[in-house]
């Protein structure tokens, strides 16, 4: 990985899953921010840069899909650096949304290798600047 630690924001209201992802990414050398709600995620992004976002679709007060659009609208550099996590990837609503808003889709249950591979692809590509910084 590059010399500067890359920051990954994990947005999932399932605290046990969020903690597993946080620990795994920290072991790989990433700086990790965790949010259990859309509001917290937006506040964290407003407070400082993130290089990639792992975003659950089902959040308590706002859908992850709506948060995705809000993030890309405010921080266009994060477009292409947000992966949607869901167990409902085959639902019509999700398929239609993904067709209109291309982004990475990580189907739950996923394995950590899928997360690491996606992060390597979006963060280590030559010429990639920091996300919303």
Regions found by a protein language model. Give the residues of each.
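Non-catalytic signal-transmission and effector/linker regions of two-component phosphorelay proteins
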Residues: 1-9, 15, 73-78, 111-133
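The feature encodes the CheY-like receiver
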Residues: 18, 60, 90
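Charged docking surfaces used in two-component/phosphorelay signaling
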Residues: 19-27
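Residue-level signal for the "D+5" position in two-component response regulator receiver
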Residues: 34, 59-62
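Acidic, metal-coordinating helix/loop segments flanking the phosphotransfer/catalytic sites
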Residues: 34-52
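Acidic catalytic/metal-coordinating carboxylates
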Residues: 37, 63-67
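Active-site residues of response regulator receiver
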Residues: 56
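Hydrophobic/aromatic residues positioned on beta-strands within the core alpha/beta folds
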Residues: 85-86
């Amino acid at each position: 990985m590059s010399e500067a630690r890359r920051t990954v924001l994990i947005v999932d209201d399932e605290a046990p899953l969020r903690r597993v992802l946080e620990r795994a990414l920290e072991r790989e050398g990433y700086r990790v921010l965790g949010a259990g709600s859309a509001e917290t995620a937006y506040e964290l992004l407003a407070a400082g840069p993130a290089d990639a976002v792992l975003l659950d679709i089902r959040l308590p007060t706002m859908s992850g899909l709506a948060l995705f659009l809000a993030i890309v609208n405010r921080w266009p550099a994060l477009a292409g650096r947000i992966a949607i996590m869901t167990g409902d990837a085959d639902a019509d609503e999700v398929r239609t949304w993904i067709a209109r808003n291309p982004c990475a889709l990580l189907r739950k249950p996923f394995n950590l290798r899928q997360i690491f591979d996606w992060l390597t692809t979006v963060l280590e590509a030559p010429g990639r600047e920091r996300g919303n910084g």
